[in-house]
Amino acid sequence: MMENNKRKRKARKKICVFCADKSKNIDYKDVHKLKKYITERGKILPRRISGNCAIHQRELTQAIKRSRHIALLPYTMD
């Protein structure tokens, strides 16, 4: 009976920020933009949370990894 009383919320589809801005590439040197897609522990946010499309999520992941490699972003946050 309790199951019938619960109402399901319809999840709103998140729009890819990079597709909406028509930005051509994601720059690994733009640390402020990349920090939005990293958790407080230093993990990269998944697609279902960030709302990015698959193409831009792959580019974002590569940019974050490049930025970490040259020490613009930390691997872990303390």
Swiss-Prot record:
Annotated Gene Ontology cellular component terms: cytosolic small ribosomal subunit
Any one GO MF annotation of this record: structural constituent of ribosome
GO biological process terms, semicolon-separated: translation
Source organism, top-level taxon: Bacteria
Disulfide bonds: none
One Pfam family hit: Ribosomal_S18
InterPro entries for this protein: Ribosomal_bS18, Ribosomal_bS18_CS, Ribosomal_bS18_sf
Function: Binds as a heterodimer with protein bS6 to the central domain of the 16S rRNA, where it helps stabilize the platform of the 30S subunit.
PANTHER family, sorted: 30S RIBOSOMAL PROTEIN S18 (PTHR13479), SMALL RIBOSOMAL SUBUNIT PROTEIN BS18M (PTHR13479:SF40)
Protein name: Small ribosomal subunit protein bS18
